[in-house]
């Protein structure tokens, strides 16, 4: 029992692995600034994240099958997002992910899929739905001045207007579907990668 518990503890190399892998998704996050082309691409950003970020998440889940790995991933993602509601939602997502993985088993595809979908939803809540819908009045109070000064993209303002309608429900559904598809793709990639490693050994 002691041996099992010891193997479940994160080591320095595990933390480094999680951090380096997380940086890949953080680069994707910052590169997404290229998507501020129009209001539609702005709204599609969390959908695109759901499709492409799963590979890194599953890589962490299959390489570091230990308690705390998913929490570290979420904390790093949240903090480097630099927006308090986004940070809070990501940290909450990290605890939810850890709970799910503890129940399903670390490395479980089912657990990774479920936790990934929830993480992407909570990330969208903190980064898109909260500022654009829930706190829109305060977030866009000085929108005109910010747009004029270049501190805010006009497409963000237009996207928020669109989102404050039935589109918000459609976006939630799209994020769930995209995240699930992203998880399926990631699962297949990881399965192929691991089987390839086993053959080479």
Question: Model-flagged regions — what are they?
Answer:
Residues 2, 6-72:
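Hydrophobic transmembrane alpha-helices
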Residues 2-20, 24, 31, 158-201:
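Alpha-helical transmembrane segments and their cytosolic interface
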Residues 15-19, 47-48, 70-72, 87-92, ...:
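Hydrophobic alpha-helical transmembrane segments
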Residues 22-30, 75-84, 119-128:
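Aromatic-anchored segments of alpha-helical transmembrane domains
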Residues 27, 91-128, 183:
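Short helix-perturbing small/polar motifs within transmembrane alpha-helices
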Residues 32-40, 64, 68, 100, ...:
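Membrane-interfacial segments
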Residues 34-38, 42, 75-100:
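Interfacial aromatic-anchored transmembrane helix boundaries in multi-pass membrane proteins
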Residues 87, 115-191:
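Membrane-embedded alpha-helical hairpins and interfacial helices in multi-pass inner-membrane proteins
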């Amino acid at each position: 029992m002691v041996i099992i518990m010891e193997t479940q503890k994160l080591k320095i190399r595990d933390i480094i692995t999680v951090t380096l892998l997380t940086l890949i998704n953080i680069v994707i996050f910052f590169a997404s600034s290229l998507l501020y082309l129009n209001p539609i691409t702005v709204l599609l950003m969390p959908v695109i994240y759901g499709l492409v970020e799963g590979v890194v998440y599953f890589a962490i889940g299959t390489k570091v099958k230990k308690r705390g790995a998913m929490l570290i991933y979420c904390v790093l993602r949240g903090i480097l997002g630099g927006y308090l509601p986004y940070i809070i939602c990501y940290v909450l997502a990290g605890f939810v992910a850890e709970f799910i993985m503890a129940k399903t088993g670390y490395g479980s595809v089912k657990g990774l899929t479920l936790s990934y979908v929830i993480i992407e939803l909570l990330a969208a809540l903190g980064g898109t739905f909260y500022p654009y819908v829930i706190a829109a009045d305060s977030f866009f109070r000085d929108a005109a001045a910010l747009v004029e000064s270049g501190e805010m993209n006009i497409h963000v303002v237009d996207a928020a207007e669109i989102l404050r309608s039935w589109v918000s429900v459609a976006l939630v559904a799209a994020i769930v579907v995209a995240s699930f598809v992203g998880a399926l793709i990631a699962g297949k990639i990881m399965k192929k990668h691991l089987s390839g490693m086993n053959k080479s050994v």
